[in-house]
């Protein structure tokens, strides 16, 4: 939340002012630092910056951000924000600054560096910030040497482990480890509870857990801000929380807390109480509405019930934001809320009231700016022009309200900036007056039955609308001329047709355009090359993709799949250094594989399937393909040829490690548009997965998929594919691959779908496949495989068709027995266990004796063992996937 970030920044500034006595140079005169710094310090700083790519730094004043002690010449403060790119190594010159008291290196790109134990040598540090800089792995225990630290900020990295490094940091007043992967049980002996001077503690978005919030939090009685959002805390909030009498902000959302609401009545300084997304039950204490400084209260998404009582003295309440949606209140709750006359934000969404809500009940809330009644039953009469609701409203959300007519009451809301009417039954046309609302900037009216636009197109063109989302309606005909101020326009799944109008080229503020799933024809206008996101999927567009991408083009995502495009892939795409997503699948593009795109540093998804790509898939130098950030590569249904070198997958760095799925789960475009409301926009791909073709919205950033099926690839499957630990789906079917199935498949622990059918693979199916506990689909049919099918839950659950067409394969689920007879009928588990035990003893004796009576029989059995691996030799320990 913005309030939390403001609190942290304020505290850091306060601490920095304490770190900077008069012997230091002031912040507003950094140039003086150059004259005060000793020659060795100047040399060390120059060496430090030379270790990185510093193109983002302020080169007009290279010493900006450096402070030196005017008596000793030692660097005592270093601040380089969003400036450095490269690996921070243990032998870095940074660790020569032994007199540093403040080190601020936030928002740099240290490219997945581990935090060096050498930081523990900087034992004069009082303020250390390494937030949002790409650090991973555990924080070294040497941090416990930094006993002078007052502030430690490690937020927004990929750090793991526990908080044991905080031991001995007894002077710590600010600790922020939010948005990482720290984990473990917070028990009473945790080093966290030894920080008796802590005033700001942020554990948000980690994996901490406890059967209840530890009582020991109540001992940190100097705390002013406590945030444990989005962890795995269970149970009740302890009564000791009432000991934190200095607390001004308390954030507990998105955990598993139960019981009654925490006792906070004694926390008279509390201004923010955020309890969203838990399992709190019972009623709301009326005292919450009269707390002297409480301005923000979110109880949304719990199991609260009963009625709401607001004392008559509540007119003096400072409560400005109240979020009560998604609970189970009973009886009349709106009248009491109308007493809170200072409210600016009110969320009562999805309350499932048994009576219609009359909007005029909110007429007393003269300061109301935001009202969310989504999912509620709204009185039809209150949506007419005669109804009265506060004219101050800027945001109005009425989604999922079963509204059938466009609300005329909007005409009176001249301050309205944000409208959300999605998932209703509104039919007819957009009224002309809507676009005349003077401050209207964001309109979300998706999933309705609207067919067109009333009146003159000039009204829409001259409106103030910047964000317009009209997905899944019945809009038809030509695309209307968009507002001159438009920034985001989405009309997915409508019936628009004809050419994309060239007037769109005059919309200089347009960043996102999504016209997917319509009936547009003709060419793609070249001017659209300047967008951030361009989505034209599943239309009838023709011609070639414009080759108009100039240097530093901001394009992040281009999807023109499922059209009738021809020609070649634009060579100028190499200029799109920010490109993350490229889809041209299911067209008629005829070209060689675009090896040049591996130079794009951020490309994560490349979809080329069902075109006319031809020629070798291996690079001209026969080395690794080398897409550093690529996670999804689909090239199925082309005419690509050749073999894959043994190191083909070596440089696929992003696919070689898995990520925590709680953070950055999907490829998404996000933008704050009003307060806590965000515009989110997800990528979509068509994926052949587990033998089925499916459309997948919300593309994961934490997993990888590869589809090379339906080409003319040959040779062996490279063992280097076992490096791709994030791989969940692999399809190499319908090629001419030969050789053995790689043993390295056993390393693909996240694999869920594997299709190797219709190749010329030989040898046996690796036993390691049965250890892949997530593997739900396997198809190795129509190859030249031999031997027994490995027995395991993931393998034996496959249909017989997944193994057919291999003359030498035997064992379940095929009927062919590995001992030359038909597979015996199913037995009861006990009988089968006894028989297998007897068989195991018999066969081992036959092999071990070797000589004596029955020598020939023993040799025959030994030969069978060497060829087929009997079922009873497979020792199975498979853990089922925990759903």
Curated annotation (Swiss-Prot):
Keywords: Cell membrane, Glycoprotein, Leucine-rich repeat, Membrane, Receptor, Repeat, Signal, Transmembrane, Transmembrane helix. Residues 1-21 form the signal peptide. It is a single-pass type I membrane protein. The chain crosses the membrane at residues 847-867. It comes from the Eukaryota. Glycans are attached at residues 58, 91, 109, 145, 189, 207, 243, 266, 305, 312, 352, 462, 506, 519, 575, 731, 779. SMART domains: LRR_TYP. InterPro entries: Leu-rich_rpt (IPR001611), Leu-rich_rpt_typical-subtyp (IPR003591), LRR_dom_sf (IPR032675), LRR_R13L4/SHOC2-like (IPR055414), LRRC69/RLP (IPR052595). The keyword Transcription regulation does not apply. Residues 22-846 are extracellular. Its main location: membrane. LRR repeats lie at residues 97-121, 122-143, 146-169, 170-195, 197-219, 220-244, 246-267, 268-291, 293-316, 317-340, 342-364, 365-390, 391-412, 413-437, 439-462, 463-486, 487-506, 507-528, 529-552, 554-576, 578-600, 601-624, 627-651, 701-724, 725-747, 748-772, 774-797. Belongs to the RLP family. This is Receptor-like protein 40. The lineage of its organism: Eukaryota, Viridiplantae, Streptophyta, Embryophyta, Tracheophyta.
């Amino acid at each position: 939340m913005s309030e939390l970030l403001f609190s942290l920044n304020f505290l850091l500034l306060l601490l920095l002012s304490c770190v900077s006595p008069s012997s230091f140079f002031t912040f507003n005169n950094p140039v003086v630092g150059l004259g005060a710094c000793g020659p060795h310090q100047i040399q060390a700083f120059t060496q430090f910056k030379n270790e990185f790519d510093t193109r983002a730094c302020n080169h007009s004043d290279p010493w900006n951000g450096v402070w030196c002690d005017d008596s000793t010449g030692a660097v005592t403060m270093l601040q380089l924000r969003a400036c450095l790119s490269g690996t921070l190594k243990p032998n870095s010159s940074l660790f020569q600054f032994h007199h540093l008291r403040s080190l601020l290196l936030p928002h740099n790109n240290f490219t997945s560096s581990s935090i060096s134990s050498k930081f523990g040598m900087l034992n004069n540090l009082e303020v250390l910030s390494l937030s949002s800089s790409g650090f991973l792995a555990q924080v070294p225990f040497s941090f416990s040497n930094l006993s002078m630290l007052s502030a430690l900020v490690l937020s927004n990295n990929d750090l793991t482990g526990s908080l044991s490094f905080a031991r001995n940091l007894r002077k710590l007043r600010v600790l922020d480890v939010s948005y990482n992967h720290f984990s473990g049980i917070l028990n009473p002996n945790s080093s966290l509870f030894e920080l008796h001077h802590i005033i700001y503690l942020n554990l948000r978005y980690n994996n901490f857990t406890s059967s209840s919030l530890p009582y020991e939090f109540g001992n940190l009685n100097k705390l002013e801000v406590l945030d444990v959002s989005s962890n795995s805390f269970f149970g009740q909030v302890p009564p000791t929380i009432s000991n934190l009498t200095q607390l001004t902000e308390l954030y507990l959302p998105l955990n598993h807390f139960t019981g009654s609401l925490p006792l906070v009545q004694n926390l008279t300084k509390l201004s923010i109480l955020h309890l969203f997304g838990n399992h709190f039950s019972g009623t709301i204490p009326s005292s919450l509405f009269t707390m002297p400084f409480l301005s923000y209260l979110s109880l949304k998404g719990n199991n609260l019930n009963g009625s709401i009582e607001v004392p008559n003295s509540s007119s003096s309440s400072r409560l400005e934001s109240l979020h009560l949606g998604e609970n189970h209140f009973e009886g009349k709750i709106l009248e009491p809320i109308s007493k809170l006359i200072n409210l600016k934000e009110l969320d009562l969404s999805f309350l499932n009231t048994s009576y219609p809500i009359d909007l005029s009940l909110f007429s007393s809330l003269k300061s109301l700016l935001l009202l969310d009644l989504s999912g509620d039953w709204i009185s039809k009469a209150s949506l007419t022009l005669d109804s009265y609701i506060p004219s101050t409203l800027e945001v109005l959300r009425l989604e999922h309200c079963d509204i059938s007519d466009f609300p005329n009451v909007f005409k009176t809301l001249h301050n309205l900036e944000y409208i959300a009417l999605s998932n209703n039954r509104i039919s007819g046309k957009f009224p002309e007056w809507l676009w005349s609302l003077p401050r209207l900037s964001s309109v979300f009216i998706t999933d309705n039955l609207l067919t067109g636009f009333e009146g003159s197109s000039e009204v829409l063109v001259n409106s103030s609308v910047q964000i317009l989302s009209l997905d899944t309606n019945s809009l038809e005909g030509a695309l209307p001329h968009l507002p001159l101020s438009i920034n985001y326009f989405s009309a997915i799944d409508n019936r628009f047709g004809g050419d994309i109008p060239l007037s769109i080229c005059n919309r200089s503020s347009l960043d996102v355009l999504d016209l997917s799933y319509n009936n547009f024809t003709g060419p793609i206008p070249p001017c659209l090359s300047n967008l951030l996101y361009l989505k034209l999927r599943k239309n009838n567009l023709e011609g070639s993709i414009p080759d108009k991408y100039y240097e530093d083009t901001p394009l992040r995502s281009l999807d023109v799949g499922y059209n009738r495009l021809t020609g070649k892939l634009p060579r100028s795409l190499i200029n799109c250094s920010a490109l993350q997503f490229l889809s041209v699948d299911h067209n008629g593009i005829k070209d060689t594989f675009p090896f040049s795109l591996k130079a794009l540093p951020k490309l994560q998804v490349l979809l080329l399937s069902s075109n006319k790509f031809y020629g070798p898939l291996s690079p001209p130098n026969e080395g690794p393909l080398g897409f550093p950030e690529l996670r999804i590569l689909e090239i199925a249904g082309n005419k690509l040829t050749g073999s894959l070198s043994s190191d083909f997958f070596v440089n696929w760095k992003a696919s070689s490690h898995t990520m925590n799925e709680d953070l950055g789960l999907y490829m998404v475009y996000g933008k704050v548009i009003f307060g806590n409301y965000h515009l989110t926009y997800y990528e979509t791909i068509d994926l052949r997965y587990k033998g089925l073709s499916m459309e997948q919205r919300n593309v994961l950033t934490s997993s990888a998929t590869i589809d090379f099926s339906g080409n003319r690839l040959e040779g062996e499957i490279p063992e280097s594919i076992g490096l791709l630990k994030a791989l969940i789906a692999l399809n190499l079917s319908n090629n001419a691959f030969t050789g053995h199935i790689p043993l390295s498949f056993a390393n693909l622990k996240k694999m869920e779908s594997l299709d190797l059918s219709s190749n010329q693979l030989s040898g046996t199916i690796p036993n390691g496949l049965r250890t892949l506990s997530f593997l739900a689909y396997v198809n190795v049919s129509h190859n030249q495989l031999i031997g027994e099918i490995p027995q395991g839950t993931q393998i034996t659950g496959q249909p017989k068709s997944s193994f057919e067409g291999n003359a030498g394969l035997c064992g379940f689920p095929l009927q062919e027995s590995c001992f030359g007879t038909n597979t015996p009928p199913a037995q009861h588990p006990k009988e089968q266990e006894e028989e297998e035990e007897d068989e195991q003893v018999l066969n081992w004796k036959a092999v071990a004796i070797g000589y004596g009576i029955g020598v020939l029989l023993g040799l025959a059995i030994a030969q069978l063992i060497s060829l087929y691996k009997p079922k009873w030799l497979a020792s199975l320990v498979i853990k089922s996937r925990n759903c």
